Regions:
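Short, flexible, solvent-exposed loop/turn segments with mixed acidic/basic and small polar residues
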Residues: 2-9, 101-112
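Terminal, regulation- and interaction-focused segments at domain boundaries
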Residues: 5-23
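Surface-exposed, low-hydrophobicity interaction/linker segments
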Residues: 50-99
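Glycine-rich, aromatic-bearing surface loops/beta-hairpins
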Residues: 104, 112-160
Length: 160
């Protein structure tokens, strides 16, 4: 018997990009009000290893038992603090440890997006345009759009 790994590549979620200046907890609060869901901050942040170290992204989660739909509000931008050694070319020639912050992204191909709303198992049950229209009524949400999942190069970052 042979396993076909193509079966695991099947995408059973929708992804909505959200452009906003809101903090994650405020956005989650407004989404809860507008969409009648109950997103709660997850204890387990999403961890991704980048060349500068470990990156952590906040996640708010809600599982709708009746419809078996999983909702996740995911931070796309964060910073990784990493150590840099710099030689001081002075009389005493010291090596200085510097901390540098580097911007990192959950999905690097979408650098302008602040958050993603990932909705799993939502094929027939939800109207994504209606969800986007409701998200767009939140103050400080500049724009939302459905992400073409075929354009995502870093799909593995969405498996958690």
């Amino acid at each position: 018997h042979k396993l076909d790994f193509g079966e695991f590549d099947e995408i059973d979620y929708s992804l909505i990009a959200i452009h906003t200046t809101l903090e994650d907890y405020r956005l989650a609060y407004f989404i809860n009000q507008k969409l009648h869901v109950n997103l709660n901050k997850s204890i387990k942040e999403i961890q991704i290893t980048v060349k500068e170290g470990e990156a952590h992204f906040s996640r708010f989660h809600y599982y709708e038992k009746k419809k078996e739909i999983s909702w996740d509000l995911i931070q796309n931008k964060n910073e990784v603090i990493h150590q840099q050694k710099e030689e001081n070319q002075s009389l005493f020639s010291n090596i200085i440890d510097l901390e540098a912050a580097k911007k990192v992204y959950m999905l690097p191909e979408f650098k302008k997006v602040e958050y993603f709303l990932k909705i799993e198992n939502c094929e027939m049950n939800l109207n994504l345009l209606e969800i986007m229209n409701k998200l767009n009524t939140i103050d400080n949400v500049a724009m939302t759009y459905i992400v073409d999942t075929n354009r995502i190069k870093s799909k593995n970052n969405l498996i958690f």
